[in-house]
Amino acid sequence: LKMCDENTICIVPIEGVTWTGLNDDVEALDKALDEFNKKTGYDIPIHVDAASGGFILPFLDPHKKWDFRLKWVLSISTSGHKFGLVYPGLGWVVWKDKKYLPDEMSFSVNYLGANITQVGLNFSRPAAQILGQYYQFIRLGFQGYKAVQYNSMQITQYLHDEIGKMAPFVNYSDHVENPLFIWYMKPDYAKTAKWTLYDLQDKLKQGGWMVPAY
């Protein structure tokens, strides 16, 4: 908040941080931002980047407040091609109310006999991903997604615990919040190791497992 001023467009917490696998505390941020806005007279909103957590939290932690139940959360984005269970590339952004979507972000055109309004940087594109998401919503429903995500979390927890037992490695956190976790090589082990995480990445790739290393 110390970096916010009259030119700040929004604050962007992340649910499912790529570098940690954890979630930012959006509820605490919303509370602090409310006090900040009252004090300064600003109306700085929150956009939640829920690329990973957006398809996890509603099903596995529905009581956690990170969404439109919070005062200053006005928009949320998530990836359909991650835990939304759709092939790449599909992303979603939703607003709390139409009034929060600036007119400057959308454009309308009369196309094939009808007025079409959209928000996007490109025009002609396939609808296959959207149809795939619609199919998954209809086929799985809330309970289906809940079952899939629960299973994903169980597998993640197992891998997290087992990798944590391996001598070369240490987990970034002692718990998992998404089907995503980070581990790294112990500094003392790395000093004498004849291989790196990039070597491990290459070996896993040979077995068909795409695991990023940084």
Q: Which residues make up each language-model segment?
A:
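Active-site phosphate-binding strand-loop segment of PLP-dependent enzymes
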Residues: 1-45
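Conserved PLP-binding active-site segment of the aspartate aminotransferase-like
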Residues: 179-193, 201, 205-214
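Generic non-transmembrane alpha-helical segments
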Residues: 32-35, 158, 162-166, 199-209
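Active-site C-terminal subdomain of aminotransferase-like
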Residues: 14-17, 59-62, 66-177, 184-189
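Active-site pre-lysine segment of PLP-dependent enzymes
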Residues: 23-40, 53-75
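Generic recognition of short, well-ordered alpha-helical segments
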Residues: 24-27, 147, 195
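Glycine-centered flexible beta-alpha turn that most often forms the glycine-rich phosphate-binding loop
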Residues: 49
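Transmembrane helix-loop boundary segments of multi-pass membrane transporters
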Residues: 145-149, 153, 197-198, 203-207
